[in-house]
A protein has these predicted regions:
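Conserved adenine-nucleotide phosphate-binding loops and their immediately adjacent elements
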Residues: 35-39
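Hydrophobic face of alpha-helices
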Residues: 4, 22-26, 51, 79, ...
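SAM-dependent transferase fold signal centered on methyltransferase-like domains
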Residues: 3-6, 54, 191
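Long recognition/docking surfaces used for binding and targeting
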Residues: 1-34
Length: 359
């Protein structure tokens, strides 16, 4: 309601305005509201620069998409960002929160997406999935981090989760979202998801699922580490995982450490256009760049017991310059000499004032 009240205050003249302007204004106000909404902001909005990275990844090399799917679509901003990068015929999404679900539908209409070209459902994605039997050219999401779910035994026979040998733990649904998204990904499609760093190294059931995705399926394409404090409502560092079912470079996984590339803000860090482009260009070229990115072999990942923690692959350590002890000693002598000279000057002034007498 706050978004709509602010939108109503804007001096629009419909006859002079394209529908895109109204949609962009709505998107802008959602972003402004997210900036003041605290933890709740993460439930419905992904910062534009992060959305841009995800969208460019899933549209890489494609001049059109038949469909794009976001299983936790929030206000729909991530879906719409994909449409800015390439032509999208149909948008699919699911959102549990009723208010946010309505935000998403309104966002679609205000961006001139015809009603028959989008299908947004209001339900719990993991517990009551929509669109079963469908696969999508692009699957994209910024799901709630380490959310709880039932992990009910019935899911052991669910086609989204069966075959992995384990279900994601009740206390952390991160890998349940990954499994769900992989299931909906077309054989020629690309999937990109934002998650906390814990998915890279946590063990037990999550370790089993992670190993299966890499060793058995070989779906993992890239791991991109993002800076901390760039999302609304949380300061934890996050990463982007990219999956493909038909990979061109089947023997390598690209690791990018962009955690130190950010612009410091008063309350929140953000990515500049140049920093976003560096991530995208490195991903496209699959480049190894000193202290920034590394193309690891599957054998290297296996040797690390399928632990994907980025510092294991990208060494960002900066060696300190060697200390010249002789120079340090000389500097200390010079400082002592300067102090002695200053003390002499002070004593001379004090004697002139009669404050200090000759001994």
């Amino acid at each position: 309601s706050k978004v709509m009240v602010n939108l109503d205050d804007l001096p629009f003249v419909h006859s002079d305005m394209e529908i895109d302007m109204l949609g962009d204004a709505y998107e802008f106000l959602i972003g402004r509201f997210a900036a003041t909404a605290g933890k709740k902001a993460g439930e419905f909005y992904t910062p534009q620069q992060v959305s841009k990275i995800l969208a460019k990844i899933v549209t890489d090399g494609k001049d059109k998409l038949r469909h794009v799917y976001d299983p936790t679509c929030g206000s729909g901003s991530l879906l719409l960002r994909v449409g800015k990068e390439t032509q999208v015929y149909r948008y699919f999404g699911q959102e549990r929160n009723n208010t946010t679900y309505n935000l998403a539908r309104m966002n679609m209409l205000l961006h001139d997406v015809r009603y028959e070209n989008f299908d947004i459902r209001n339900d719990d994605t993991l517990e009551n999935p929509a669109f079963l039997g469908h696969t999508f050219d692009a699957v994209i999401a910024n799901p709630p981090y380490s959310a709880k779910w039932t992990a009910d035994s019935k899911f052991e026979n669910d086609e989204r989760f069966s075959g992995y040998g384990k279900l994601a733990p009740k206390s952390k649904a991160d890998f349940a979202f990954i499994q769900h998204m992989v299931h909906y990904l077309d054989d020629e499609g690309t999937m990109a998801v934002v998650l906390p760093h814990g998915v890279l190294f946590r063990g037990a059931a999550e370790g089993v699922i992670r190993r299966y995705l890499i060793e058995e399926k070989n779906y993992l394409e890239a791991v991109i580490g993002l800076p901390a404090n760039i999302f609304y409502g949380t300061s934890i560092p996050t990463c982007i995982l990219v999956f493909k079912k038909c990979r061109q470079q089947e023997d390598n996984v690209l690791f990018i450490d962009a955690s130190n590339d950010f612009e410091k803000g008063k309350n929140q860090n953000h990515l500049s256009d140049a920093q976003v482009e560096r991530i995208i260009n490195t991903y496209k070229r699959k480049e190894t760049i000193d202290k920034y990115s590394y193309s690891a072999t599957l054998q290297e990942i296996a040797d690390n017991d399928y632990n994907l923690n980025i510092p294991r692959y990208v060494d960002t350590f900066e060696e300190e310059a060697p200390i010249d002890l002789d120079q340090v000693q000389q500097d200390l002598k010079n400082i002592d000499k300067e102090i002695a000279e200053i003390e002499q000057e002070i004593n001379a002034y004090l004697k002139e004032l009669g404050v200090l007498k000759d001994e």
